[in-house]
Every structure is written in C-alpha cells, then in structure tokens.
Amino acid sequence: MKRIDFTLYAITDRSFIKGMDIAEAVEIAIKNGVTVVQLREKDISSREFYEIALKVKEVTRKYNVPLIINDRVDIALAVDAEGVHVGPDDLPVGVVRRILGPDKIVGGSAYSVEEALKAEKEGADYIGAGSVFAQPVKPEAEVIGIEGVRKIKEAVNIPVVAIGGVNKTNAYEVILHSGVDGISAIAGIFDGDIEANTKDMLREIRRAFKERGK
Amino acid sequence: MKRIDFTLYAITDRSFIKGMDIAEAVEIAIKNGVTVVQLREKDISSREFYEIALKVKEVTRKYNVPLIINDRVDIALAVDAEGVHVGPDDLPVGVVRRILGPDKIVGGSAYSVEEALKAEKEGADYIGAGSVFAQPVKPEAEVIGIEGVRKIKEAVNIPVVAIGGVNKTNAYEVILHSGVDGISAIAGIFDGDIEANTKDMLREIRRAFKERGK
Ligand code: NI
C-alpha cells in the first residue's frame, strides 16, 4: 500500500460540503478521478470523527483509494485507514511512524526545505508542501509560492504534493514549474461542483505532466 | 500493570490549576496520596496535548503511579501511558481495547448498569460511575446518586470508581454506601489547596474503607 498515486489528493472540509454527507462528497470526487483522500475534521468529538471515518472508509475501500486521516492517529487505527497526515500542531512525524509501524502511510506538512528534510528523516512517506498561494480560509498559512514548493521537491527523495490555494485555474502552472507529484486541494475540489472541479483539475494536472514528460 | 490501586483517582482540569503547570499540580497530588492520574485536556492541539502528557508522564513514572489519558488513544501510545479512559463522546471501549491490546488499562464511563455491563463486556478494566452529585462545572451530566453508583458496583466484576462532585465533605459517605473501589475527582482535588484536598479526601476514603471492613 506504500506505492501511492498522488496525482490528485482531496482533503475534506465540511464547510464546503453542503447538502450531502462527507462520504457522498468523497464518492463523487473519487468517481471523477481523485487518487488519495484525506479526512480532516476539527471541533468534533472523537466518537463523531470515528463514525464519519467509518463511512468514508467504506467508500475508499470500495474504490481502492487510500484513506489518510488528518492528525488523529487513533482514528486511523480505529478504522484501519491507510495512513495519517500530520502538520505542525499535530504529533511529530517520528512519533506517528513509531506508533503506526513501517506499513502505514505517514505524511508531513512543510513550508520550508528544512522542515521537509526533517519530516523525511523522521520517516514521512510524502510531503504536503505549501501554501503555494494565499488562501482566504487560512490567512495564517505561510505562502511559499511555486518556487518554494519546487525547492522542497528538489530537496527530498519522497513524493511531494503541492497544497494551498491550488485549483483548476492554476494546477497546470504548479505542476509544470514545481515538479511535484500531485496536487492536494480542499476548496479546489469541494467548493462548488465537485464533479466538474475534479475533472477539470485532473485534466490540467495531466496536461502539465505530459508537458513535463512524466 | 493491570493491578491498580483505585483509592484516589485524580483527573486534571487546567481551569482549576492556576499559577503552576499541570505536571507540578499532579506531583503535589501524587506526593499526598493520589493513586491514579488521568490527564484530561480539551480544546488544545494534539502537539500541545502530547507535550503536556510527556511532562506528566515523567512525574507519574517517578512515583510509579499509572497515567491514564482521557479520550486520546494516540496520545497514550505516543507517551506510553498506562491506559486510556473513554466516555460516551469518545471511541467505543471495544475499539480502544482492540487498538491497545490486552496489556494497557482501558476505563469506561457509565451512568447506568446497562452501560457499565456493556463497557465490561467490551473489555473495560474499570468503570467510572456517576455523576454521584450535581456539579456546577458539568450541568449536563446525569446525576445518579450514591444509590446509582452502588447498583453499578454490584452489577459488574471490575473495579468501580465513583465520580462527579465527590470531595472531602462527602467521600466518606460515597465509599461507605456505594461499595466502590475508589473516588475519582477533578475539583475535589485540584480546586484550591491540592495538598490539603488530597490528604483530607484520602483520610475520609480510608476511614470508610475501614468502616466497611475493606
Ligand atoms: Ni508558466
């Protein structure tokens, strides 16, 4: 399960998902080409997180897409998710690797080469590098641009996904000039028409991969 | 480590712990007779919870007192705590037991005999039964009285600690009439003079144990 297709990595955010449950939204995204799903929940109880994760796991299992849980190693273990993604406010990458063992996927966030190298050294399987662009929903995030993402990609030997304000209008440029292995998106996928967002983004990513000769 | 002395089980609450850090407060409580420590944190990041838990674990390890983490199985694994306590909003007892295996302590909350039997069946090592009394800090908690706690104690074959509004003024009555194995307290220990609270409560509990012939 460690060999992952990072082309289009969707991160859930219930604030964008209206009128349907998260599992339904995830299913639309997967049907239209999302290759990895990260379930991200804040400000809910462990029991609620667990129950949502169980439902989402049913969908990802059905389509054989890896499910990554944001932050909560216990929820990942509880639903037998494929992995965990941790950022600066979460458990350190090395601690997560120790708990999960060698077979689960561990991802780390980085906005600098130094952080990315640290996460790689601690056992991360991939890096979420960003923020590429400024995001209205996350004004506190450090913006490193396509250039900052490219430096991270060049520094590490593990896959890198670009994150932060990437959508169908800029995914082509990000892939082409940063050299990353895929795009990670929240609003870019779940804000609005999930089917159209996913298809358009995937087309732009593939167009850039082709241009790069990947 | 499964053989626990549940006599006086302290649950941390930072809102009562002023002018010192949680590890210091826990050390005072342990020095004065607390036999189990539960670290309970809400509304902080996983990283902060982890860092506090590491500090508290240093103290509990020094005095050879078991450390139980409230809710977060991942934090317990990260700091190698002795166990986890889960309530109705947390992961189910059976899931926690499956993740932690047979050697860690798993505690469950119950306000009814039915819930207590369910937790026991799912693999709980002990029950936190209550609320014994109404608590201003937790107005939503179901109050079951000393009688409700006694029914739970009589129904299960695992240790029971009484929780909810128990302090030095009522611990004697609770122990004497409910037959429980110990008292669990938050405010009863950490609100005010921790040393005096702990000593007084322990004296009352022991007086009732003696009266009961335990
Ligand atoms: Ni260009």
From Swiss-Prot, chains A, B:
MF terms in GO: magnesium ion binding; thiamine-phosphate diphosphorylase activity
Positions contributing to 2-[(2R,5Z)-2-carboxy-4-methylthiazol-5(2H)-ylidene]ethyl phosphate binding: 165
Reactions catalysed: 2-[(2R,5Z)-2-carboxy-4-methylthiazol-5(2H)-ylidene]ethyl phosphate + 4-amino-2-methyl-5-(diphosphooxymethyl)pyrimidine + 2 H(+) = thiamine phosphate + CO2 + diphosphate; 2-(2-carboxy-4-methylthiazol-5-yl)ethyl phosphate + 4-amino-2-methyl-5-(diphosphooxymethyl)pyrimidine + 2 H(+) = thiamine phosphate + CO2 + diphosphate; 4-methyl-5-(2-phosphooxyethyl)-thiazole + 4-amino-2-methyl-5-(diphosphooxymethyl)pyrimidine + H(+) = thiamine phosphate + diphosphate
Domain of life where this protein originates: Bacteria
Cofactors, names only: Mg(2+)
Pfam families assigned to the protein according to its UniProt record, in alphabetical order: TMP-TENI
CDD domains registered for this protein in UniProt: TMP_TenI
Annotated transmembrane regions: none
Any one cellular-component term (Gene Ontology): cytoplasm
Annotated residues for binding of 4-amino-2-methyl-5-(diphosphooxymethyl)pyrimidine: 38-42, 70, 109, 138
Cofactor note: Binds 1 Mg(2+) ion per subunit.
Gene Ontology process terms (BP): thiamine biosynthetic process; thiamine diphosphate biosynthetic process
The keyword Transferase is annotated on this UniProt entry: yes
Pathways per UniProt: Cofactor biosynthesis; thiamine diphosphate biosynthesis; thiamine phosphate from 4-amino-2-methyl-5-diphosphomethylpyrimidine and 4-methyl-5-(2-phosphoethyl)-thiazole: step 1/1
Residues binding Mg(2+), per UniProt: 71, 90
EC number: 2.5.1.3
Record has Disulfide bond as a keyword: no
Keywords, alphabetical: Magnesium, Metal-binding, Thiamine biosynthesis, Transferase
Function: Condenses 4-methyl-5-(beta-hydroxyethyl)thiazole monophosphate (THZ-P) and 2-methyl-4-amino-5-hydroxymethyl pyrimidine pyrophosphate (HMP-PP) to form thiamine monophosphate (TMP).
Protein family: Belongs to the thiamine-phosphate synthase family.
Listed name of the protein: Thiamine-phosphate synthase
Species annotation: Caldanaerobacter subterraneus subsp. tengcongensis (strain DSM 15242 / JCM 11007 / NBRC 100824 / MB4) (Thermoanaerobacter tengcongensis)
Higher taxonomy: Bacteria, Bacillati, Bacillota, Clostridia, Thermoanaerobacterales
